[in-house]
Amino acid sequence: MTSADLNTLLTELTLDEKILLLAGKNFWETHEIDRLSIPSLKVTDGPNGARGAQILDGVPATCFPACVSLASTFDRQLAYRIGQALGEETQTKGAYVLLGPTVCVHRSPVGGRNFEAFSEDPLLTGTLASEYVRGLQSEQETRRFVVDEIISERAIREIYLKSFEIIVKQAEPWCIMTAYNKVNGHYIDATPRWLTEVLRHEWGWEGLAMTDWGAGSCVESVRNGLDLEMPGPARIRASDLVHEALKDGRVSESDINDRVRRFLQLLDHVGKFCDRKTTPEERAVDKPEHRALIREAGAAGIVMLKNRGNILPIDVASVKRIAILGPLADVPSAHGGGSASMTCHYKISPAEARASRLGNRVEFVYSKGAHIYRALPDLLEGVTAASGTPGFLIEYFEDHNLQGQPFETQVTTRSYFTTLDQIEIKPRAMSARMTTTFRPTEAGSHYLSLSGTGPTKLFINGELDELRVRYSFEAGMEYEVRIEISMPNATIADIYILDKQLSVHLGFVPQAEMDQNLLHEAAELARDSDIALVFTGNTTQWESEGQDMEAMTLPPYDTRTQDKLIETVAAANPNTVVVNTTGSPVELPWLNNAAGFLQAWYAGQETGNSIADVLLGDVNPSGKLPMSWPRVYEDTACYGNFGFDSQVSKRVEYVEGVFVGYRHFDRHWNTDKQALYPFGFGLSYTTFGVTDASLEGAVWDSDAQTTTVSVSVANTGDRAGAEVIQVYICPPAIEGLERPVKELASYAKVVLNPQEEKVVKVDFGRDAAAYWDEAVNKWRVVPGQYTVLVATSSAPDDVKSRLSFEISEGLTFDP
């Protein structure tokens, strides 16, 4: 459809129809205008797979590795292939827009959404996310809602905006979602600064800006470039509010036309005007080629951080008995929580993968070793609803106090429900009651947990109990369990999408299971085995969108049961290998006692197979850390300035400025604050030589001109493997301005057979040498001598060659 066609269509819309298109119809779809054959558009989460409309028990979907795992590959081509596959998956859910990727720069290791994002480095984030977006489009947190983030213009430009700038200029995404929080005193959608001046004017972006499930203002958002409010139905853009703003002149119809035009352009981009049929049914399509891609990508992202005595890969010929231990040994931790959660086609746990790969050739013994519950598991056994069917009866009432007759009833087999996808139309006030008859099979003082999105009460045989309780049950007796919940009074200052929503979870664990001595059992099994594999990490309860982590440690934070497990097992067996599944670094107090350590991230539905491929040597680990790994949280640049729960002002000051990640740790090298593992670090089963580095071209008269580093890389070992050549630039000193010691300029990954050698070329341009000059609001390259480091990590010991070039005349350029 031409621009003229879109303008004609715009003129045919009535004012009320245009206002309707300013916001969504429901949680995932926009309005259709049948009179003009304008179709509805469906969007879907998330960054690691197309989940579909149902948040709970939805149509099965394919779960890909998290973006932090993808970042560890340093592989642009792989990111493009993942994007292509996600485009195909999006279509199976009847959607035309995938709400991903997340490209926030990692500022703190306790950020709850780090796993969804790529890296602490804006260049690595921007280049890999660009390929992800290009591939996708080729086919078709702690009170983050109100926090005011105070950031210098230089830090914004050099660190936090840079990855977005790279993506916009390289991949031209069709949609961008805005954040909830303020930046320097203003909500993102309440000022023309970001959406209009930076995105559209400076960078020339022409896509659609939508809210990340909640917006803060009607007038400001319409005037300042926010095109679509999601989810629907409209709240801040309700028809009466927009008409009122039009009447008193705070918003013009021209403003509305600009917003609707962007929406129509998006419909055209995704082909909806060629495919005007109603939203297709969601389908579960499990493609073998996507299975293989996920397994490949998951293994490529695994980072080997320790391999004492070459304990890995496991020598199956000499190993007779392997202990598989840990809370995540038989639990496939495929993804983090929040938008990344989904109902997968399947998930392979490490224990399942070991058994399927080695069969009877090796004896396996298993122990869970530690409990890491935050909320206890669902109560599934021995529960009967009032109708006599297994499960729970849920009754919904049109007030806050369970008065009158329920307007809807449901039966669920799980002890969890949410109205986010259970009821399409909800009253202005609502409460619910969930009941069951519970007949336990064993006696004991069993454990229960309760959580809810509003005021929630648990009754057992009519008695009110606390949120987390132990209750003495007799085997075979019947107990009436009742949960009552009323609607939360959610506001923008809390959790926008939970306004007028109800969610409840009841958890249960028998006393015998909770109180067993897991540590002793694990130690005994480890002692009698040739090698002990300990699988640790986070679950969706501990690492999720919507909440930051309470500490840079393995959970539970109070008991530290996972750390105790590793220490106990390593004391029993020196051949202990830890495989950790988290989206961020954690403290490693046991590291000196473990023989091996793999960081596996969230590798998707093939996670167990990907881990097995690396442990058994079928895949040579080539992952590199996309962030620095601190020894303790106190060593990070943002310590004391992350989150604001203890601050009345609700302000977070980015006092570290541009010194994020390795830019910070470079200041502290060879001190007690030196990073435990540097950015870009990762071990291999083979060895590499990096020699004969040279440099060509260093005059940048335009953005198109590049400088090329050529280097010879040889595989000097006896296994095929891959190395990542990382090129860093060290700028000359500037009086009165501190710059990072070095910054990543570019990188390249090379795959080599044993004894093979290749020449690798790595290009970078003037952006790599520039800093943001706040005095003139331009990028500036100063004259002087620049040092180029050719390295295999950001650590000084991993620099393989030093080159230099001279800039005789400085230059400035616009964003």
Q: What role is predicted for each listed range?
A:
Residues 783-784, 807:
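A short, compositionally biased
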Residues 1-772, 778, 785-794, 813-815:
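Glycoside hydrolase catalytic-domain context in secreted enzymes
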Residues 797-815:
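Short beta-strand elements
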